[in-house]
Amino acid sequence: MESIEQQLTELRTTLRHHEYLYHVMDAPEIPDAEYDRLMRELCELETKHPELITPDSPTQRVGAAPLAAFSQIRHEVPMLSLDNVFDEESFLAFNKRVQDRLKNNEKVTWCCELKLDGLAVSILYENGVLVSAATRGDGTTGEDITSNVRTIRAIPLKLHGENIPARLEVRGEVFLPQAGFEKINEDARRTGGKVFANPRNAAAGSLRQLDPRITAKRPLTFFCYGVGVLEGGELPDTHLGRLLQFKKWGVPVSDRVTLCESAEEVLAFYHKVEEDRPTLGFDIDGVVIKVNSLEQQEQLGFVARAPRWAVAFKFPAQEQMTFVRDVEFQVGRTGAITPVARLEPVHVAGVLVSNATLHNADEIERLGLRIGDKVVIRRAGDVIPQVVNVVLSERPEDTREVVFPTHCPVCGSDVERVEGEAVARCTGGLICGAQRKESLKHFVSRRAMDVDGMGDKIIDQLVEKEYVHTPADLFKLTAGKLTGLERMGPKLAQNVVNALEKAKETTFARFLYALGIREVGEATAAGLAAYFGTLEALEAASIEELQKVPDVGIVVASHVHNFFAEESNRNVISELLAEGVHWPAPIVINAEEIDSPFAGKTVVLTGSLSQMSRDDAKARLVELGAKVAGSVSKKTDLVIAGEAAGSKLAKAQELGIEVIDEAEMLRLLGS
């Protein structure tokens, strides 16, 4: 007679097998009623023997007790977003950029997937067992949704198969099929509950329930699209190969994933998916196109927040017709004058739209737009509403011409348009209240100086009351002065002052980004900081020297040079430093002066280390003059291979690069 443990093991194995056939292979072997019977049998046994319940049991999907709040999980590998293209011309331009960046006219194949309209999640498996799950969040830190993800039957609690890595982070999209969405809303209408506008909102709301038992009742599902952390194992060297391997281990992958050999095949895939879109049974808003070769992906690299080797090719957004009631002009951080159409409110793609961007004067002329016109509105990328065209055949008789301002609508300064540029700009600089507001909002933003609690409404009041003119004035604010603002009590005022004090300690890269120099985003600011090391060196740099920084061309170099040449900007920087803004001094390492076997070498770490953390090893190597890289290439001098080293070790051996183990690294570090 079988023991209770054996019965439980067999039941769990059987249920996992049928979950795999149903959710991954779409080929169920048994009726739903039989699956339910097996599940009931397992539940009854575990109820009688709770000491034998395991975390990966299929019964553990039903949800734990409600959470008071979500804790945070920091992504070990950032969850980047994708750049978008919206037409064939833009995709072909992306294809050309990829081809141009690759050397020796290498052939590129593309892995094409559906762009699911759901919620991006990260799921970490250790030794094949699901241990945590998180939302994308800001790309660096997400919310811990482990308890909720465990309730989604499509997601395996335990991977099955061979050669499963010790640590594997699966990334993908949680979404709600149309049928499930309609059922949720039908139930909500009947019971007086919340009715969701679209399946994505319903999926997000379901996944972020503090009570996992509610999530368990929602018919969420999941498709994998990539990998994050990989330790103690190997994966295929192509994106498609990795997805197919995940499928073997029990992770759901869309059967619409397709390998395309050319740009023409990609376009054919795009149009086929667009044609099939209404019959898929779930929402998508485009296709995702990725370079299939992992080696080519490494060559192409990343920009600030997106890979160069992938793009989202969005479908045309839904469109509606409405009337333009007025055109107003907004002033941005750099003085750009942007015309905005004020519309008769209309629902577009589930959202009530009352404003739409008109971009610039050229766009108004191209459209032939007049105030009062009937227009077609599109939510470009399903995010930013824009005017597509004017319905000339239905133009009312009382329309009025749109007159682009010659003077700033906020400060009255002259508006100038540089020859060759589409954007007209206010020349008022920081005397313009609008520019001042937007500059200050940028300065305190999370990726700049990161002043917690300093919201847009506070900045608006500070400028309107003439309390603040430059970023340096922010650090002169007192709690007493802040309490004079609307909805600002003594406690909140003190919190803002404390946040400003904390923000004084920053990094050189963040400081440069916060200054708001034209065309200088996060990545460029980081590159400038790394190259020049000090503010003094950067201020003294010529346009020619600035162009030596990776990805800095003549236009960006000119903007940076002109910014520091302006006396008022230098004065603001001096004031900021006088108020205590500071960052760590750069560690200048001259490899030629260091007597170390690692000096001047490009080193790659792979596998797990037992005697020190990887971060500690990197720091020690840098101290000894090494440059630590993240991937193996022909430029790599040395690979340090820990336990369970994977594809990087194989590539190093293929290229004939010197490889040492952890013990040899420790010996050399000690020498």
Curated annotation (Swiss-Prot):
Gene Ontology BP terms: DNA repair; DNA replication
Domain BRCT: 593-671
Catalytic activities: NAD(+) + (deoxyribonucleotide)n-3'-hydroxyl + 5'-phospho-(deoxyribonucleotide)m = (deoxyribonucleotide)n+m + AMP + beta-nicotinamide D-nucleotide
Residues at which NAD(+) binds: D32, A33, E34, Y35, D36, S81, L82, E113, R136, E173, K290, K314
Matching CDD domains: BRCT_DNA_ligase_like (cd17748), LIGANc (cd00114)
InterPro entries per the UniProt record, alphabetical: BRCT_dom (IPR001357), BRCT_dom_sf (IPR036420), DisA/LigA_HHH (IPR041663), DNA_ligase (IPR001679), DNA_ligase_AS (IPR018239), DNA_ligase_CS (IPR033136), DNAligase_adenylation (IPR013839), DNAligase_N (IPR013840)
Cofactor(s) this protein cannot do without: Mg(2+); Mn(2+)
Binding locations of Zn(2+): C408, C411, C426, C432
Catalytic residues (positions): K115 (n6-amp-lysine intermediate)
GO molecular function: DNA binding; DNA ligase (NAD+) activity; metal ion binding
Pfam families named among the record's database cross-references: BRCT (PF00533), DNA_ligase_aden (PF01653), DNA_ligase_OB (PF03120), DNA_ligase_ZBD (PF03119), HHH_2 (PF12826), HHH_5 (PF14520), Nlig-Ia (PF22745)
GO cellular component: cytosol
Keywords: DNA damage, DNA repair, DNA replication, Ligase, Magnesium, Manganese, Metal-binding, NAD, Zinc
Entry annotated with the keyword Nucleus: no
EC number(s) recorded for this UniProt protein: 6.5.1.2
Entry function: DNA ligase that catalyzes the formation of phosphodiester linkages between 5'-phosphoryl and 3'-hydroxyl groups in double-stranded DNA using NAD as a coenzyme and as the energy source for the reaction. It is essential for DNA replication and repair of damaged DNA.
Similarity annotation: Belongs to the NAD-dependent DNA ligase family. LigA subfamily.
HAMAP family to which the protein is assigned, alphabetical: DNA_ligase_A
Protein name per the record: DNA ligase
Native organism: Shigella boydii serotype 4 (strain Sb227)
Organism lineage string: Bacteria, Pseudomonadati, Pseudomonadota, Gammaproteobacteria, Enterobacterales
